[in-house]
A protein has these predicted regions:
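Flexible, low-complexity linker and terminal segments
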Residues: 1-178
Length: 178
């Protein structure tokens, strides 16, 4: 194959190089020649190659803010929920609760320490402004991960007081009751 072994990225043809052509496009390419291919075996190979390339991407570790070492609740978010979740965490900490917050910036691939971080806390809530796609994705990628979920599909940002109220209910409930 015409790939760099470490990165799995195809070599680029240098203009004028005999036997090579620089080809751009969205159609599936043959793994050996780079020519357009509709062969099913080649398609399988190329899909697996793309998945391997994505898995090799180095992303920063997932960081935890707040009471990172001994929180009773970890609040997990992604993207634009950061400010609202951080404000809710700070309000809960001001009330004396031990709370931490982790905000994903990368989800494919996940940070290498994802399972370690999520497995460290008694209760984890994934707060999303959708129907729970991140929670479902994390359950599929992290063995044994069963988070609580706070989902809103209103087309509006979270209201911090609603987050605080919901998270406080989780914190007050015994682990076996929630």
């Amino acid at each position: 194959m015409l790939f760099r072994s470490a990165t799995k990225v195809r070599y680029w043809a240098i203009p004028g190089q005999v036997g090579y052509a620089h080809i751009l496009g969205g159609l599936e390419k043959d793994g050996r020649t780079g020519a357009i291919s509709t062969d099913p075996e080649n398609h399988d190979l190329m899909c697996r190659l793309r998945a391997e390339k994505v898995a090799r991407i180095s992303v920063p570790d997932l960081t935890v803010q707040g009471d990172a070492d001994d929180a009773d609740l970890l609040i997990v978010g992604f993207g634009s929920t950061y400010g609202h979740l951080m404000s809710a965490m700070e309000e809960l900490r001001a009330k004396g609760y031990k709370v931490a917050q982790a905000q994903f910036r990368h989800i494919n691939p996940l940070p290498k320490n994802t399972a370690e971080v999520l497995g460290k806390y008694k209760k984890v809530v994934v707060a999303e402004q959708n129907l729970g796609q991140l929670a479902a994705y994390l359950r599929s990628k992290v063995d044994g991960f069963v988070p609580f979920q706070f989902n809103q599909v209103k087309g509006q940002p979270f209201v911090v007081s609603e987050l605080v109220e919901n998270f406080e209910t989780l914190l007050k409930a015994p682990s076996s009751a929630v």
